[in-house]
């Protein structure tokens, strides 16, 4: 299933939080939660993002305390899909 995803997290010690946005077909979901009390919805999913020039594949680590973006970068448009298959099955 194709989707666009954006995730960013705070490194502030007093208020750790994560913001995740997913756009699946015509549906939009925005989730804001603290990393202490909620699971990471992208955990254990391999994300494959194809830009105009590059192919990125990474495993989302728990807890994610960095900024990762698909679809919010105006310079590139990302097409992302969540899959558990090996990256060799993805073609550009």
Curated annotation (Swiss-Prot):
Superkingdom, natural source: Viruses
Keyword vocabulary terms for this entry: Transcription, Transcription regulation
Chain's role: Acts as a transactivator of AC102 and HE65 genes. Therefore, participates in the global recruitment of G-actin to the host nucleus.
Protein name: Protein AC152
């Amino acid at each position: 299933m194709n989707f666009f995803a954006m995730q960013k997290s705070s490194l502030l010690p007093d208020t750790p939080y994560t913001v995740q946005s997913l756009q699946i077909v015509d549906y939009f979901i925005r989730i804001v939660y603290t990393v202490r009390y909620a699971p990471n919805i992208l955990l254990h999913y391999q994300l494959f993002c194809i830009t105009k020039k590059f192919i990125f594949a990474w495993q989302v680590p728990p807890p994610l305390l960095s900024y990762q973006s698909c679809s919010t970068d105006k310079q590139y448009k990302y097409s992302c899909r969540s899959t558990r298959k090996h990256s060799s099955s993805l073609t550009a």
